[in-house]
């Protein structure tokens, strides 16, 4: 009976689900032994360092990972960096197949002036900072201004904006990093804008996350009702199901505004950032809008506009992902998950 030795590089969700797929292929005619190699001391990738701490239910998938790891012929080698401590070619010489499952950990850039100022961060840095990722404990996160801007129209952007706009005591029962809780408790931020380049009908938020926003106990959530009405007209009589769900959720927020709280999270649509203003640090953002340029004064800008893969020596990359054809990179080398997309 053929027995295949497989190395999986990366111990995040993609790596574990690749291992599970191999385990499910095992039968009386073939078997697999799986060695998972992780750069960090702990596994689970984004489930550990990328999920908003106030959404603990998402982390229950770790129980699935534990079940996968407890299967026969599975081993985890943590604290080992592929590309420096061991090369891809060395792995290929020792295994029948090598699977790259390292995810996409680098934040995409806006490519506008001022992006390198102090107070301009990527969500790829900010999110692991508040999630206790060992690489990001010392990140400079200035929260001393009263206004922050989050650029992006997906759930990561919404998570970041929500974390900034929450009453910090709400984070005490969560597994938010202690250094982050301390920083949030001393934060001066009271207004958070979340800005999207296109209209509400194009936003990549998901409706369950949008429907949670009115439940925030200490935060006003503001959406311009006219923006949503215009988006509903643009979406047409039969919009896609996800678009309709999003617009319905946003309209509900827009029609039931709150203003009694000290903290506010406000959505801005059709706002394209042109420049981040400042001399030594962030002082504002200039946006292009359908009604002309608009400047928002702020002391913190966090971009959440997508991710790209971190390169590994010996693996071909292009446009922030591993070069592949249907997951195959080259002979005996494959890629899965965000590093593939």
Regions flagged by a language model, labelled:
Residues 92-97, 144, 292-299:
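Core beta-strand elements of the Rossmann-like FAD/NAD(P) dinucleotide-binding domain
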